[in-house]
């Protein structure tokens, strides 16, 4: 299925944001047990169900690292905000500062992934947000930095990407 340049550019940038946020969780909470009651058990249960559905086998691990790929975008930043003491202060402060912007990305992400019509301001909103992340801390936002650099060098590279079909059925 062919998609337009704007949709694929947004897809690349939002995917990079999600990858970086997941890596933040893996780096700082990945070894934590999913049985730790300080974590939202409903979130963990949803992620376990998604993992089992995707892989046709039962969940047999006990760490957050094994589930982080099955968290929604909104769940990822909420998890970081819920446990600021588990992250370096610079990261927890930045996520808290950028929570409203991350919340604004969720409907954009859903429009892209579910092949809904884009709003006229979706691309500039995501582009500006990525530039802010890079300006604030390029070492934290490695995937975002690399993706934006790649886009600046060759904007058409996104036309070779594909939006995973399974992404069409999941909300962020």
Positions of predicted regions on the chain:
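Amphipathic alpha-helical interface elements
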Residues: 1-172
């Amino acid at each position: 299925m062919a998609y337009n340049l704007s949709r694929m550019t947004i897809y690349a940038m939002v995917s990079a944001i999600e990858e970086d946020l997941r890596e933040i969780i893996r780096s700082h909470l990945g070894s934590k047990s999913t049985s730790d009651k300080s974590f939202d058990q409903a979130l963990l249960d949803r992620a376990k169900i998604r993992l089992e559905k995707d892989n046709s086998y039962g969940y047999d691990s006990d760490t957050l690292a094994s589930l982080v790929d099955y968290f929604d975008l909104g769940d990822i930043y909420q998890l970081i905000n819920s446990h600021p003491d588990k992250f370096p202060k610079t990261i927890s402060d930045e996520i808290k500062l950028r929570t409203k912007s991350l919340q604004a990305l969720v409907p954009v992400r859903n429009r892209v992934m579910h092949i809904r019509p884009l709003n006229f301001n979706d691309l500039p909103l995501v582009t500006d947000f990525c530039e802010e992340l890079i300006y604030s801390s390029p070492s934290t936002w490695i995937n975002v930095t690399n993706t934006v650099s790649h886009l600046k060098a060759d904007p058409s590279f996104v036309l070779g990407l594909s939006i995973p079909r399974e992404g069409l059925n999941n909300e962020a």
